[in-house]
Swiss-Prot record:
Pfam families for the chain: AAA, AAA_lid_3, CDC48_2, CDC48_N
Binding site for ATP: 231-238, 508-515
Protein source organism: Thermoplasma acidophilum (strain ATCC 25905 / DSM 1728 / JCM 9062 / NBRC 15155 / AMRC-C165)
Record CDD domains: RecA-like_CDC48_r1-like, RecA-like_VCP_r2
UniProt keyword terms in alphabetical order: ATP-binding, Nucleotide-binding, Repeat
Descriptive protein name: VCP-like ATPase
Coiled coil regions, renumbered to chain: none
Temperature-related activity annotation: Optimum temperature is 70 degrees Celsius.
A single GO molecular function term of this UniProt record: ATP binding
UniProt cross-references to NCBIfam families, sorted A to Z: CDC48
Length: 745
């Protein structure tokens, strides 16, 4: 919308690469209305004015009438996300002098090293600004903040838009600007990565009632009173609550669950009443209750009277909130099922939003945020590629783990530069400028940072691709359609109205590549890979084995997309009524059945079982809806054996006389594991012949054939072929045929 001498646009959050850079993202139509080119300077006005440089908007922003600016610029002009601002093109002058003051607490003092003015002048070159703006200087950070902010105290010339030039003199005052730290170290939406969907839901639930209660009045509905954020520790629940409070301009009151509890009668309830009373007096307010499960547990399960009284007090306070819409309660917990059910109903906590473990793209966004002010010594394109690689390595990491990883990487870099630094003197600017954090610093940090959400259940990061598996082309195609497609393209299934398979069973002789196939699926579909090994699950304590299965499926849901791999599933899920182990395996089978049936709500979780003996498995597991597909992995034929040999010799220096075709011909009955062993033994034969050998000859392979024998003979192949034919029949036909053959089902 055009206004005299400017246009009116709606404020949206900045791109993840923009915070602290004074960038203004405008679409082509807005630039045309302003007669502005990329690189021009525009003024943004709401309560106050600020300036920034024009950058190209995302293609999806075209004709939406929005302007993307970061939280510093929003704070400078007094606007929030969703507000309308006036944007106009302005001319800047090169500043002769700019005076800056750090924005820190009044009782703090910063001691800058020599040459700080030159460093700041170079870091801010061509940066547009106005007097009284807050600006961020790349590379300068304060502990606990994403970046150190400065107040533009004075510019010469004054009261006009200026930019820093080569000749601009920078003066930095050591005394802080007259700001409170809470106001400026504000956590904004740009500081939250990988949670855009959840953030959208929370903003709709919280920001709208706080900023525009008239919308709810017009529709004749009452705004929500509360939201519970739940998920593993470190995923960003508290961060979201603070960001929402900051961006909505609401007063933020925090209650840390355990701190509210008191041994004196009635004191815990009194503390709660005081906080709710203060929230209503200073509305609009957000009351944030961290670890809400510690003060509002299920009343029937607690021994103490205090907890029961606190829960009752919280219920009456939430029911009695007068300023509905002006006071919102946000609870955070990682134990949602431990909260009293009376709180978990509409009218109290209206919504429950899961803040889960971030996926690969989410991890990249979080890493972008935490490395925003970090000197990585690489171009934007290289940084982008590197952070994508780091996102691949960090399966199962939550936001707090990624922050710890970045911090540890910086400490690794610091340790490299410490010998050059005299800690008793100010650090010279040239040392500060040459400090960079390298890829090796990150990779070394990865060795010491363990993902917190998966410490109980280790999620493997497979690195097996389809090309690493020789042969089995039909099986690979079937698995891709069954597993990979639903994980990579869920929209196809939604469009065609198909429900993806929940799981499938791979069966065949030992060594044919069942585990390898499962790992390849996880790698190619970018899914987490959780392996359940039978003996690790079994426990002598009643209920512990079932609990282990439940926890694994719960973790799979948290780190989805995930593949749960049950290796040797026949050892933990044999046919019920055939074992004498006091019912442990029967209970495990029952738990598996209920877990598999519960996968309807587990989007992005696929279960793969592997076994050599599907005939002794419990038949209830083999029906559609649990293991939807039974896939037979046959021993490799000649073509498949050749393909497997090529895979295992691709990094092996072969002599010219090596004929893999001939070796494939000679290895009838060899499975994938045998062929891998054969190649290894051939390499060892080459070493035994000559420790300085540079290649492996045909003779080495033929000698290896004398010691490495096939795992599968004609009798085994016949057994599995019969089994494969039987497994493809109906349950009644299958049972009869297996009983006739002396097997059972």
């Amino acid at each position: 919308m055009e206004s005299n001498n400017g246009i009116i646009l709606r404020v949206a959050e900045a791109n993840s690469t923009d915070p602290g850079m004074s960038r203004v993202r405008l679409d082509e139509s807005s630039r045309r209305l302003l007669d502005a080119e990329i690189g021009d300077v525009v003024e943004i006005e709401k309560v106050r004015k600020t300036v920034g440089r024009v950058y190209r908007a995302r293609p999806e922003d075209e004709n939406k009438g929005i302007v993307r600016i970061d939280s510093v610029m929003r704070n400078n002009c007094g606007a929030s996300i969703g507000d309308k601002v006036k944007v106009r093109k302005v001319r800047t002058e090169i500043a002769k002098k700019v005076t800056l003051a750090p924005i820190i607490r009044k009782d703090q003092r910063l001691k800058f090293g020599e040459g700080i003015e030159e460093y700041v002048q170079r870091a801010l070159i061509r940066r547009p600004m106005l007097e009284q703006d807050n600006i961020s200087v790349p590379g300068l950070t304060l502990a606990g903040q994403t970046g150190l902010l400065f107040k533009v105290v004075k510019t010469l010339p004054s009261k006009v838009p200026v930019e820093i030039g080569e000749e601009t003199k920078i003066e930095i005052r050591e005394e802080p600007a007259s700001e409170v730290l809470e106001e400026v170290s504000r956590i904004s939406y740009e500081d939250i990565g990988g949670l855009s969907e959840q953030l959208g839901k929370i903003r709709e639930m919280i920001e709208l009632p706080l900023k525009h209660p008239e919308l709810f009045e017009r529709l004749g509905i009452t705004p929500p009173k509360g939201v519970i954020l739940y998920g593993p520790p470190g995923t960003g629940k508290t961060l979201i609550a603070r960001a929402v409070a900051n961006e909505s301009g609401a007063n933020f009151l925090s209650i840390n669950g355990p701190e509210i509890m008191s041994k004196y009668y009635g004191q815990s309830e009194q503390k709660l009443r005081e906080i709710f009373s203060k929230a209503e007096e200073t509305a609009p307010s957000i009351i944030f209750i961290d670890e809400i499960d510690s003060i509002a547990p299920k009343r029937e399960e607690v021994q103490g009277e205090v907890e029961r009284r606190v829960v009752a007090q919280l219920l009456t306070l939430m029911d009695g909130m007068k300023e509905r819409g002006h006071v919102i309660v946000i609870g955070a917990t990682n134990r949602i099922d431990a909260i009293d059910p009376a709180l978990r109903r509409p009218g109290r906590f209206d919504r429950e939003i899961e803040i889960g473990v971030p996926d690969r793209n989410g991890r990249k966004e979080i890493l972008m945020i935490h490395t925003r002010n970090m000197p990585l010594g690489m171009s934007e394109e290289e940084k982008n590629k590197f952070l994508e690689e780091m996102a691949d390595y960090t399966y199962g990491f939550v936001g707090a783990d990624l922050a710890a990883l970045v911090r540890e990487s910086a400490m690794n870099a610091l340790r490299r530069y410490l010998p050059e630094i005299d800690l008793d003197k100010p650090i010279p600017t040239e040392i500060l400028e040459k400090m960079v954090v390298t890829e090796d610093d990150f990779k070394n940090a990865l060795k010491s940072i363990e993902p917190s959400s998966l410490r109980e259940v280790m999620v493997e990061v497979p690195n097996v691709h389809w090309d690493d598996i020789g042969g089995l082309e039909d099986v690979k195609r079937e698995i891709k359609e069954t597993v990979e497609l639903p994980l990579l393209k869920p929209d196809v299934f939604k469009r065609l109205g198909i429900r993806p398979s929940k799981g499938f069973l791979l069966y065949g002789p030992p060594g044919v590549g069942k585990t390898l196939l499962a790992k390849a699926v996880a790698t190619e579909s970018n899914a987490n890979f959780i392996s359940i090994k039978g003996p690790e699950v079994l426990s002598k304590w009643v209920g512990e084995s079932e609990k282990a299965i439940r926890e694994i499926f719960k973790k799979a849901k948290q780190v989805a997309p995930a593949i749960v791999f049950l290796d040797e599933i026949d050892s933990i899920a044999p046919r019920r009524g055939t074992t004498s182990d006091s019912g442990v395996t029967e209970r495990i089978v029952n738990q598996l059945l209920t877990s598999l049936d519960g996968i309807e709500v587990m989007n992005g979780v696929v279960v793969i079982g592997a076994t050599n003996r599907p005939d002794i498995m419990d038949p209830a597991l083999l029906r559609a809806g649990r293991f939807d597909k039974l896939i037979y992995i046959p021993p490799p034929d000649k073509e498949a054996r050749l393909s497997i040999l090529k895979v295992h010799t691709k990094n092996m220096p072969l002599a010219p006389d090596v004929d893999l075709n001939d070796i494939a011909q000679r290895t009838e009955g060899y499975v994938g594991a045998d062929l891998e062993n054969l190649c290894r033994e051939a390499g060892m034969n080459a070493y035994r012949e000559n420790p300085d050998a540079t290649s492996v000859s045909q003779k080495n392979f033929l000698d290896a054939l004398k010691t490495i024998r096939p795992s599968v003979d004609e009798e085994v192949i016949k057994f599995y072929r019969t089994l494969s034919e039987t497994m493809s029949k109906s349950v009644s036909e299958r049972r009869k045929q297996l009983q006739d053959q002396g097997l059972y089902l």
